């Protein structure tokens, strides 16, 4: 299968809430089929009847428009310690939370859920023995989630490499090392990385660790979903692919596609993960600039727009 283009719903959180409003906007205005749904739209911590009702409503909107939820990801308000939390009861809460999230995404037709592998506190990260203990604990937590996710019908889990050590995967080498360890853990379903070409430790002595094209060459065989945004030298944010940012940005479609192909990309999902501050005039530019970003990539990667019915 060829590459497909998708959209992470981070920038739509709080700007949309009702399933029909969200999905109609994606289909009608953004013209993209595949969506990585962030948890804020159907939060696993909400009461069961609310989750079931909103999942039904979301499913109906998907069927009506042709939009597809391909995966579920924690959103802007879900970047938390999770399985790196030092308290066992808090970790237990998040095991159950992610099991519910797996059920929601499976019911919507998605194939995977994920977040960061774990986020450690300063105290725990700076103690090598404690750090190793929590890595083992986090893998055990993910193993329990994986068994549940398999029963729910998901195909894999994913973890997002970040840009600092205590959030894991901050360099290409550390990213590959953790992935090797997760593969060796032999979970009930695989746990792959979900790399972001704009992440990486800016203090690394290896320039590849902050080079979007080096990441694109390194990860496709291990990262079914790859986050992209317009990358600036200052790593200053999740910039959209608009004319203004493209004039100064590092990411060009032809060059990125070449790097991905060199890395073995075949049927990867290339996911736009963008953001705008809650400031005017940016706040009201979100839909138009998302649409511009989708249109920028659509000639190069299948957006699925032909399958939409709205």
Task: Indicate where each model-derived feature is located.
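Acidic/histidine-rich catalytic cores of soluble enzymes
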Residues: 3-4, 139, 148-244, 304
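Active-site beta-loop-alpha junctions enriched in small/polar residues
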Residues: 8-12, 38-42, 74-77, 118-120, ...
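Conserved beta-strand positions in the central sheet of alpha/beta enzyme cores
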Residues: 36, 71, 114, 158, ...
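Alpha-helix N-cap and loop-to-helix initiation/capping positions
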Residues: 46-54, 85-97, 126-137, 166-177, ...
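Active-site acidic/histidine proton-transfer and metal-coordination neighborhood
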Residues: 64, 81-192
């Amino acid at each position: 299968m060829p590459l497909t283009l998708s959209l992470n719903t981070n920038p739509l959180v709080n700007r949309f809430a009702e399933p029909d409003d969200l999905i109609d906007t994606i289909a009608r205005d953004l013209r993209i089929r595949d969506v990585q749904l962030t948890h804020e739209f159907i939060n696993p911590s909400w009461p069961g009847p609310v989750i079931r009702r909103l999942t039904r409503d979301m499913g109906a909107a998907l069927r009506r428009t042709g939009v597809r939820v391909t995966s579920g990801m924690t959103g802007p308000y879900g970047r938390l310690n999770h399985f790196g939390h030092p308290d066992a009861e808090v970790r237990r809460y998040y095991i159950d939370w992610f099991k519910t999230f797996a059920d929601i995404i499976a019911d919507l037709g998605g194939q995977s859920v994920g977040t960061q592998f774990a986020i450690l506190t300063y105290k725990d990260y700076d103690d090598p023995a404690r750090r190793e203990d929590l890595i083992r604990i986090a893998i055990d937590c993910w193993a329990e989630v994986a068994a549940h996710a398999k029963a729910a019908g998901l195909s894999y889990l994913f973890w997002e490499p970040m840009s600092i050590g205590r959030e894991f995967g901050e360099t290409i080498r550390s990213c590959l090392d953790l992935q090797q360890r997760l593969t060796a853990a032999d979970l009930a379903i695989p746990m792959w990385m979900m790399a972001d070409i704009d992440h990486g430790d800016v203090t690394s002595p290896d320039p590849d660790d902050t080079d979007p094209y080096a990441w694109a060459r390194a990860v496709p065989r291990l990262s079914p979903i790859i986050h992209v945004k317009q990358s600036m030298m200052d790593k200053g944010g999740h910039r959209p692919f608009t004319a203004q940012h493209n004039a100064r940005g590092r990411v060009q479609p032809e060059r990125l596609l070449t790097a991905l192909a060199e890395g073995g990309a075949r049927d990867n999902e290339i996911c736009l993960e963008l953001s705008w501050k809650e400031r005017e005039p940016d706040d009201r530019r979100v839909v138009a600039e998302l649409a511009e970003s989708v249109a920028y990539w659509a000639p190069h990667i299948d957006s699925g727009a032909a399958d939409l019915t709205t």
